[in-house]
From Swiss-Prot:
Belongs to the NAD-dependent DNA ligase family. LigA subfamily. GO terms for biological process: DNA repair; DNA replication. InterPro entries: BRCT_dom, BRCT_dom_sf, DisA/LigA_HHH, DNA_ligase, DNA_ligase_AS, DNA_ligase_CS, DNAligase_adenylation, DNAligase_N. This is DNA ligase. Its cofactor is Mg(2+); Mn(2+). One of its GO terms (molecular function) is DNA ligase (NAD+) activity. Keywords: DNA damage, DNA repair, DNA replication, Ligase, Magnesium, Manganese, Metal-binding, NAD, Zinc. The active site is at 128 (n6-amp-lysine intermediate). The gene is ligA. It comes from the Bacteria. It catalyses: NAD(+) + (deoxyribonucleotide)n-3'-hydroxyl + 5'-phospho-(deoxyribonucleotide)m = (deoxyribonucleotide)n+m + AMP + beta-nicotinamide D-nucleotide. It holds the Pfam family DNA_ligase_ZBD.
Length: 719
């Protein structure tokens, strides 16, 4: 995740980051909701979503069709449980992280409803249970189904397992509405979790990580007897479809649940003021360590149901509710050292080496220090950071697991009488190649000027060059790139992109054969050569993206390719583009410069990056060698002709086993087809894998052709 403030992002940088965030959040949604194997903390996940929402708020025109703000959770991943389409979607809640966020939420409710006096709207406040969301359906008082949230629209049918939870009644009392969907959270008590782990340890089996994942895994057991043995519990707090509403308030409905025999949280209360909500939030936070269940915040809801109806919903969340999350966990440790890492674009990033400390159940040894200003304690505009306290080796520091995938240092604790180390001097020379490291005006990052001669950048740039959305060369993963880069034999080494395409020829004239080296073999080497040869012709936008020009991500590469249509035209423009002289308001720059700025979405920052790249003689040498081996296809000629799917709209659904979603999309586009995320009358073809649910059902209903993954490969001739 970028550390550039949203206000400083260009439109192009924002679009590229939204694309990265959409992929990252979808990945973590699948791990959390569908596989119960989260890789990052809740705080880190929340930070990704906050960043996405902040960028979308600042650039509303860039909101993507696959934006995380338009979806909930992840589609069910297991084909062992039948899909269940929720009568009413199970939406997630927006998050608040500060008192000010809560005041903004309450204010937005009053503004939306209008003309209501202060403190006239009541809100409920209840703990946010860290478990698995569940919808339980009753018809004529009888429990007929239980389903997980899934992606909010379609969940998994876990009825047999739900029936084993003692706290969930199989029948409702007489007088209950004919159709009732009770929603709440399935969880495992901390005490039961400890007992289960003690039992597993005594039996010599692997213990479980945490109650939430254990509860989710227990609920997805194919054998309901296993679920029954896990002592799962339930809190009711919401509802889906109801044939008749017994009461007219949120608190009243929860009381009805209690009367029907459902457990409800005893800490739920109603307040008429923001101060009351915040006081209860703090009270629950104080009580949190003593509770026998995990919570990660407090949920506030408008109490009157008629006001909830008026407020309605956004695309993925209600306007009448919000989750006030607890702050990330922190710990105190010692800063033992500061290392400088050099990234693909030459950015010098400081990383703290810490005395090992446990934060939120995870042992932390490294933390981000962001940039040199953050270490100094003074921002770009002279504003103080941490009240102006700098960070020095040997300091006691507060580490927080939040925001980034790796933790961060949020403060320094100065101990009276303790002598501090010397102020940290941020290097002005690249530690990887010795080139000068410069910091451009207005930027927080210092960068190496070494380009492809810098080993740190060269390896990363080659990895980027062969990555999926660039040249996509199968068989050249991270380890292989590092092997070839570090190879001393001239017949094996790959130090620049062109070296990839001369590898086979160099091998033919060498005594050192790649297939004789450990980790390679005749078959894998042939596949590698075939994969390389398959990319000797490449789509123009992939070629441009693969060059690793700063600020030219996937989005900008496609924009430039569509604008110039051929590589020759683009290169000519890049070489002829001359920006205006600094301080000369009458100078508009060369005609080629003005033409580049006229490309939709391309601003001066991107244009300058392109001009700087082509203005470097070493880069032009690298390009000349590459163009001797590779032909970038003209944009208008790059789509396959004569393909049976050319011009058609294709939807991929279910679990794909032979390719990822990105690969499927790329393959479809390569054959002239368009891909869509949902099925409609405009859809021509649906490719369905195991676990296909609502999209498959809709395709069948509309009479749209449906094929499996193997048939897709045969259809496009890539079997």
């Amino acid at each position: 995740m970028s550390d550039i403030s949203v206000e400083k992002l260009t439109e192009l940088e924002a679009a590229a980051e939204l694309e990265r965030l959409a992929r990252a959040i979808a990945h973590h949604d699948e791990l959390y909701h569908a596989k119960d194997r989260p890789e990052i903390s809740d705080a880190a996940y929340d930070a990704l979503k906050r960043r996405n929402e902040a960028i979308e708020a600042h650039f509303p025109a860039l909101v993507r069709d696959d934006s995380p703000s338009r979806r909930v959770g992840a589609a069910p991943a297991l084909a062992t449980f039948a899909p269940v389409v929720h009568a009413r979607p199970m939406l997630s809640l927006d998050n608040a992280f500060s008192d000010e966020d809560v005041r903004d939420f309450v204010g937005s409710v009053y503004r939306f409803l209008g003309q209501l006096p202060d403190d006239s709207i009541a809100f409920t406040a209840e703990p946010k249970i860290d478990g698995l969301s569940m919808s339980i359906r009753y018809e004529n008082g009888i429990l007929v189904s239980g389903a997980t949230r899934g992606d909010g629209t379609t969940g998994e049918n876990v009825t047999a397992n739900i029936r084993t939870i003692a706290e969930i009644p199989n029948r409702l009392p007489a007088g209950a509405p004919a159709v009732v969907e009770v929603r709440g959270e399935v969880y495992m008590a901390k005490s039961d979790f400890l007992t289960l782990n003690a039992q597993m340890e005594a039996e010599g089996k692997q213990t479980y990580v945490n109650p939430r994942n254990t509860a989710a895994g227990s609920l997805r057991q194919l054998d309901a007897k296993v679920t029954a043995s896990r002592k799962l519990r339930f809190f009711a707090y919401a509802w889906g479809e109801m044939s008749d509403m017994p009461v007219d308030t949120q608190l009243g409905m929860v009381e009805v649940f209690r009367q029907w025999g459902f457990p409800v949280n005893p800490l739920m209360k109603r307040f008429n003021s923001v101060d009351g909500l915040l006081a209860h939030y703090r009270a629950i936070g104080m009580e949190r360590p003593t509770l026998d269940y995990d919570i990660d915040g407090v949920v506030y809801k408008v109490d009157r149901l008629d006001l909830q109806t008026r407020l309605g919903f956004r695309s993925r969340s209600p306007r009448w509710a919000i989750a006030h999350k607890f702050p990330a966990e922190q710990a105190l440790t010692i800063l033992r050292g500061i290392d400088i890492q050099v990234g693909r674009t030459g950015a010098l990033t400081p990383v703290a080496r810490l005395e090992p400390i446990t934060v939120g159940g995870v042992v932390v040894t490294n933390a981000t220090l962001h940039n040199e200003d953050y270490i100094k304690g003074i921002g770009q505009k002279g504003e103080p950071i941490r009240e102006g306290r700098d960070i020095r080796i040997g300091d006691s520091v507060i580490v927080q697991r939040a925001g980034d995938v790796i933790p961060q240092i949020v403060d320094v604790v100065l101990e009276e009488g303790k002598k501090r180390g010397e102020p940290y001097q941020f290097p002005h020379v690249c530690p990887a190649c010795g080139s000068h490291a410069v910091r451009e005006e207005g930027e927080a990052v210092r960068r190496c000027t070494g380009g492809l001669i810098c080993p740190a950048q060269a390896v990363e740039r080659i990895r980027h060059f062969v990555s999926r959305n660039a040249f996509d060369i199968e068989g050249l993963g991270e380890k292989q790139v590092e092997f070839f880069f570090n190879a001393e034999d001239p017949a094996l080494c790959i130090r620049s992109p062109a070296d990839i395409f001369t590898l086979k020829k160099r091998q033919e004239n060498s005594l050192t054969k790649l297939q004789n080296i450990e980790g390679f073999g005749a078959t894998s080497v042939k596949k590698l050569y075939d994969a390389i040869d398959a990319r000797r012709e490449i789509a123009l936008h992939r070629f441009l993206f693969g060059l690793g020009i700063r600020h030219v991500g996937e989005v900008n590469a496609k924009r430039l390719a569509r604008a110039y249509l051929s590589y020759a035209a683009f290169e000519k423009a890049a070489l002829e583009a001359v920006p205006p002289k600094e301080g000369d308001r009458t100078d508009k720059g060369s005609e080629a410069w003005q033409d580049m700025l006229a490309v939709e979405g391309i601003g001066s920052i991107v244009a300058e990056a392109v001009v700087d790249f082509y203005g470097e003689p070493h880069n032009r040498e690298v390009l000349a060698a590459l163009l001797a081996e590779v032909t970038p296809l003209d944009e208008e000629a790059r789509v396959a002709t004569g393909s049976p799917v050319e011009g058609k709209t294709v939807v991929f659904t279910g679990s794909l086993e032979r390719m990822s979603r990105d690969e499927a999309k790329a393959m479809a586009e390569r054959h002239g087809a368009k891909t869509a995320g949902s099925v409609s009358k405009k859809t021509d073809l649906v490719v369905a894998g195991p676990g296909a649910g609502s999209k498959l059902a809709k395709a069948t209903e509309l009479g749209i052709e449906v094929i499996n993954e193997d048939d897709w490969f045969k259809l496009v001739g890539e079997d």
